[in-house]
Every structure is written in C-alpha cells, then in structure tokens.
Amino acid sequence: LFYGGFFDALLYPITQLSPLLLHDTRHLCNAFIGLLGIVATYRLGACLGSPTTGLLSALFLVLTPRFFGHTFNNPKDIPFATFYIWSIYYLVQGLKFLLTLSKKQIWQIGIAIGLALATRVGGVILFFYLGIFYGLVYLWMLQDRDRPAHIIRGFLIQGIGIFAIAYI
C-alpha cells in the first residue's frame, strides 16, 4: 500500500546475476544506495553552504546510528531517503536557475522525484515542495519584472515537464 516496487524490481536482476547469496547481494545493494544518500547529503550541504558544510552534513549522517544501521538492512526506507535527498538537492540547485532550467536539470529533478515516488508514496510531497519553490520564486520575480504571463508560462512548461518525467 505505501511502498512501491522499484527497489525490489531493481534488485531482482542483480540478485540473479550476482555470485553472492541472495541476502548478501540485497544487503550490498542496500548499502550502495545508502552510500549514494551520503553523497547526496554532502552535495546538498555543499550547495547550501560550503564543502566543509557538506562534509559535516555527510559525517553527521554517517554517525547517526539509526541511518547507519538501516543502511544495510532496510530496503524500503533507505532507498526512499536517498532518492528524497537527491530530489531536494536538485530542487535547491535548480532554484538558482528556476526560470531558465536546462533540459538536463529538468530531467534530474524529474527522475529524482520519480524514483522517490516509485519507492514510497511519501515522495508525492516533493511535488508540493516543487510548487512551493515555484510559488516563492514567482512572488520574488514579480517584484523585478512586469511580465507575469511570461513567468507563469515558463513555470508551467517546466513543471509539466518535471511532472511528466517523474510520472514515467
């Protein structure tokens, strides 16, 4: 009901090809996804602050016993947390270029949100974050520009593109 089958579907062919035992392969893949979450945390911290901030963010995440313990054993929450943090990272990174997002950035945001949504239904909240980010930037841009129709059209095109990519 609350969990998507993406991670299990991803693991099935890997477990068929791996020479390791089924559970060992699943734990190894889960740990790799957890490592990607740590990398995403570093990048988000570096994007919001400095490389030192990113390093401290990643270090604090690694030193959190619950995250570290679940990294090897939780095939639902760790992939969701990883894809969620990647989504937040790409959303924050995209705030700098929100009206002029490149196709690559639209794909990155859409894929990250789509993976979070495919892992757990809680990923739907990322669409609300996207809407809040667009709304706040829209209000900020209205102070400097007198062409709200141009801004709304750009936001709608980007938002529909991100939604379509995430849906696929």
Describe the function of each predicted region.
Residues 28-36, 63, 78-86, 127-128, ...:
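Membrane-embedded alpha-helical segments of multi-pass membrane proteins
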Residues 2-19, 31-32:
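Short hydrophobic/aromatic helix or loop-helix immediately within or flanking a transmembrane segment
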Residues 57-62, 69, 85, 89, ...:
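Short helix- or helix-capping micro-motifs
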Residues 93-104, 126-163:
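Perimembrane helix-loop-helix junctions
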Residues 40, 79-99, 112:
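Specific aromatic-rich, kink-prone transmembrane helix
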Residues 66, 72-79:
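Short acidic/glycine- and proline-prone juxtamembrane loop motifs at membrane-interface regions
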Residues 26-33, 57, 76, 113-117, ...:
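Alpha-helical transmembrane segments of multi-pass integral membrane proteins
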Residues 28-48, 52, 86-90:
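Transmembrane-helix motifs of polytopic, lipid-linked glycan transferases
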